[in-house]
Amino acid sequence: MKKVAIVGALLVLAGCAEVENYNDVVKTPAPAGLEGYWQSKGPQRKLVSPEAIASLVVTKEGDTLDCRQWQRVIALPGKLTMLSDDLTNVTVKRELYEIERDGNTLEYDGMTLQRVARPTPECAAALEKTPLPTPLPTPLP
């Protein structure tokens, strides 16, 4: 039993935290300037193809949609939380992605995302099919 506790503590300290139950994650409101639509620009090493697009939708209340598209759309709802003082997106599949913002640029899952006016049509369709629990950001003009 002591070994399990020690290993668990080491994983948390090493930044390898794991979420056992998505519903137990405490949602954090989006910090100022993070609410909105974010999208990859150009090829990203973390995506399967140079034509693939990664998008992140963040509501003011901290709900998210991680939307990646290439030959199909994979859209995972999630929520923002603080893990070890780092702002992190936790998806319903319990995947953890740290978020770092610098102006209109995000570092997210090893990718660089830029602020955009609205989601891609494919991600907008995913949002219509499975809406987030809180209101979406207002699209930019």
Swiss-Prot record:
User: Which superkingdom heads the taxonomic lineage of this protein's source?
Assistant: Bacteria
Q: What is its main location?
A: membrane
**Which positions make up the signal peptide?**
1-15
Lipidation residue positions, type S-diacylglycerol cysteine? C16
Stored PROSITE patterns: PROKAR_LIPOPROTEIN (PS51257)
Please provide one cellular component term from the Gene Ontology annotations of this protein.
plasma membrane
Keywords, sorted A to Z: Cell membrane, Lipoprotein, Membrane, Palmitate, Signal
Instruction: Answer yes or no on keyword Signal.
Output: yes
Q: Where is the lipid attached (N-palmitoyl cysteine)?
A: C16
The places in or outside the cell where this protein is found are: Cell membrane
Cross-referenced InterPro entries? YedD, YedD-like_sf
How does the UniProt record describe the way this protein sits in the membrane?
A: Lipid-anchor
What's this protein's name? Uncharacterized lipoprotein YedD
